[in-house]
């Protein structure tokens, strides 16, 4: 069916978790208060990362800034960058808490060389300093709900509203992921994309209340909407399907899975003078911005 491979026993909640949660670091974390992040001798701890098929150690700061640089545009406003930094840090620490200490991190990030290559020499210095400042100025800050670290998904552009976590995951464990209106997203030039995929006899058979696809019929089989999006590299989880000359025409709205923070709206809010905390509290209901304490990470001063 157009190259589509169905996972017979696929579970929606587990699939989303695999997509949205970063893999763990070689690290132990204890959350026991609201004081500042403790660092050994004032230097950044090291984490083990798989890069170019090899494992190596880099500083936690280098890794966090590298993810931040890869995940959001360098020309974003300061408060939007800070909000993104908090989401990345929260995901890191939640993975640490949930998954343990023995896994090598594989989440992609940009090195300094990749930043310069992607941004160009004219912007590299300015953008790097903005990323570093956003990371440093939110040092230790994470999002918590009811005293626990939360799942912190984000996406580039919504279809005009974000989706409910409880609805997307089919679970009541995500009360802080409520659907939020993002009216300016629909005005973005990247809001709509049209593509063609091989095969026909495909039909959207389920959507959530925000309009994102939850289920697709492919011939005699039914597949999860997010798996369908990723298999066919669609821009968004909000899409329609139409038979077209033996193929399937896909019209997608937005960019990404639609959960959590819309980066586009976050940048607009920052431009309007909203703070990092105001942005985060808009997209994540009833959460608090806290600070982690007592971090113990495997050290290697040489990063080897």
Report the location of each language-model feature:
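Conserved, single-site charged/polar hotspot
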Residues: 1-304
């Amino acid at each position: 069916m157009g190259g589509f491979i169905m996972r017979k026993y696929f579970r929606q909640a587990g699939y989303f978790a695999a997509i949205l949660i970063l893999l763990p670091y070689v690290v132990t974390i204890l959350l026991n208060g609201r004081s500042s992040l403790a660092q050994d001798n004032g230097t950044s701890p090291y984490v083990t990362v798989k890069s170019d098929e090899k494992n190596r150690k880099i500083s936690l700061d280098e890794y966090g800034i590298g993810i931040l640089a890869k995940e959001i545009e360098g020309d974003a406003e300061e408060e939007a960058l800070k909000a993104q930094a908090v989401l990345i840090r929260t995901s890191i620490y939640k993975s640490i808490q949930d998954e343990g200490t023995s896994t090598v991190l594989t989440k992609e990030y940009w090195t300094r060389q990749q930043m310069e290559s992607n941004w160009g020499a004219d912007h590299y210095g300015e953008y790097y300093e903005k990323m570093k400042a956003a990371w440093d100025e939110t040092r230790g800050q994470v999002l918590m709900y009811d005293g626990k670290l939360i799942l912190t998904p984000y996406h580039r552009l919504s279809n005009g509203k974000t989706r409910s976590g409880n609805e997307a995951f089919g679970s009541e464990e995500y009360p802080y992921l409520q659907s939020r209106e993002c009216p300016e997203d629909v005005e973005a030039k990247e809001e709509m994309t049209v593509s063609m995929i091989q095969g026909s006899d495909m039909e959207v058979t389920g959507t959530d209340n925000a309009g994102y696809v939850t289920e697709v019929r492919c011939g005699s089989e039914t597949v999860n909407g997010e798996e369908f999006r990723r298999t066919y590299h669609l821009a968004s989880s909000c899409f329609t399907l139409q038979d077209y000359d033996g193929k399937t025409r896909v019209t997608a709205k937005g960019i990404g899975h639609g959960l959590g923070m819309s980066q586009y709206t976050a940048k607009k809010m920052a431009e309007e003078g909203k703070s990092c905390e105001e942005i985060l509290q808009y997209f994540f209901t009833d959460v608090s911005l806290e600070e982690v304490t007592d971090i113990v990470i495997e050290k290697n001063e040489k990063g080897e």
